Regions:
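Bacterial Sec-dependent N-terminal signal peptides
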Residues: 1-46
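Compositional signal for N-terminal targeting/processing segments
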Residues: 41-429
Length: 429
């Protein structure tokens, strides 16, 4: 802390010197405040370090919301928006997550794609899905880490791929330190993986385990090319060295799955080292975003076409030469997911998969069991609150009720106001 002390009687100084002395005092004060601001910038922690203190939980989000003015305009502004988009998605605030992602310029590639999708032919994914699964032994799909839409979509691939001999599900979220996940068959918060603490991702892994997949970590330390190369090496070591004829799914973030020669991404290194040409499909750029769903070029080419289909479903994009489009993206195909429709303000339609249903939490229930505002997490009673919840939601004091997306079964609800926990049990029938 910097203090500048003024002489309380400085106005009584020699009048000829008074004006110049005031200027000196002002300059001293300005310099002190500037220096103090610089010190504060240097003392400001990386937002990921701040969030880690509370396990990247609701409490982390609440703390960082109150620090918004410190991070905006600082050297940590972009990672702040990046992390906030992830944390908002974990508590069911998907619109806020998208807005934070847009502030962090994480959608820049989508603008470029919108300008190039002028002569695109689209067909339902269901017409080619069987062929993709049957004619490949390695399929790589991707996501944007703040958007669970792709995770819900990938769940729909698991059963059909398993029926065609795929036995491993590799994901970059998984930590190698959780070596017992395949035996335990549950996802531990903060232990199994980072992104998988989000309910839909947790359910993706839970579903894969229930079907019979073996979960495989492949994340690597480091940055840039070394990280990409090491990720490919980990896939080889953790799967192919043990099962040379294996068929498997790989789920990664954004461009890491690209297998285009010369791009130095994980998918390309894997192809080069193994001779296996994986089928790589971008499932990230054409997913939910308020800003980009309103763009005329995207709406006309994709979302309106899907809305006009008898059954709204994902579509695959081809160019006028009937090649899977985009053929210059470094991936084999782009998949466009249907326009998001919110059933309730906090429940997107893609969240009700695998027989999930809406369960209402009203103010009367909250008053009896929880806090006026906070976050509620719904854990399977058979798993307990150390595991990733089936759903969770951050609610405000003015919300009369809200919905959770839950399966039939018994649940442990945990209410958190940022300082304490309260618990209740429910049965969804």
């Amino acid at each position: 802390m910097i203090f500048v002390v003024f002489n309380q009687n400085f106005t009584l100084l020699n009048p000829q010197k008074s004006h110049s002395m005031k200027k000196i005092y002002f300059l001293l004060l300005l310099s002190a405040l500037t220096f103090q601001s610089a010190v504060a910038q240097n003392e400001l922690q990386n937002p990921y370090a701040v969030a880690k203190e509370d396990g990247f939980s609701y409490r982390s989000l609440k703390k960082l919301i109150n620090m918004d003015s410190l991070y905006v305009g600082s050297q940590f502004e972009r990672p702040y928006h990046d992390l906030m988009s992830i944390l908002y998605s974990r508590v069911g605030h998907y619109k806020d997550a998208m807005r934070m992602a847009e502030k962090g310029n994480l959608f820049s590639d989508k603008t470029r794609l919108a300008r190039t999708y002028e002569n695109v032919i689209t067909i339902p994914l269901s017409e080619v899905m069987d062929s993709i699964i049957e004619n490949n032994r390695v399929i790589m799909l991707n996501e944007m880490h703040f958007n669970p839409h792709s995770r819900a979509f990938v769940i729909s691939w698991l059963e059909k791929c398993y029926q065609n001999g795929y036995r491993y599900f590799a994901a970059d979220t998984l930590f190698a330190k959780d070596s017992l996940v395949n035996e335990r068959r549950t996802m531990l918060i903060g232990e199994t993986g980072f992104y998988s603490d989000e309910p839909v991702f947790g359910d993706l892994l839970r579903t894969a385990l229930n079907i019979g997949y073996t979960l495989v970590p492949y994340e690597a330390d480091g940055w840039g090319v070394d990280r990409e190369r090491n990720e490919a090496d980990n896939l080889i070591k953790n799967i192919l060295d043990k099962d040379p004829e294996a068929k498997f799914l790989v789920y990664g973030g954004m461009g890491h799955i690209s297998d285009r020669k010369g791009w130095s991404m994980m998918g390309g290194f894997f192809k080069e080292k193994t001779g296996i040409d994986p089928f790589t499909m971008d499932c990230s750029v054409m997913t939910f975003s308020e800003q980009y769903e309103s763009m005329d070029s995207l709406r006309t080419v994709f979302f309106d076409r899907i809305d006009a289909m008898p059954v709204r479903e994902p579509i695959i994009c081809y160019d006028t030469a009937k090649r899977i489009y985009p053929n210059n993206s470094g991936m084999d195909a782009t998949c466009c997911l249907p326009r998001t429709r919110f059933i309730e303000d906090n429940i997107p339609d893609w969240k009700l998969y695998n027989g999930k249903m809406l369960y209402t939490i009203n103010r009367r229930f909250i008053k009896k069991n929880g806090f006026p505002e906070g976050c509620v997490s719904a854990f399977l009673k058979s798993e307990g609150e150390q595991c990733v919840p089936i759903d969770q939601y951050m609610y405000g004091k003015d919300e009369k009720e809200f919905k959770l997306g839950l399966y039939k079964g018994e649940y442990l609800l945990r209410f958190d106001d940022g300082k304490a926990y309260k618990h209740a049990t429910i049965t969804v029938k």
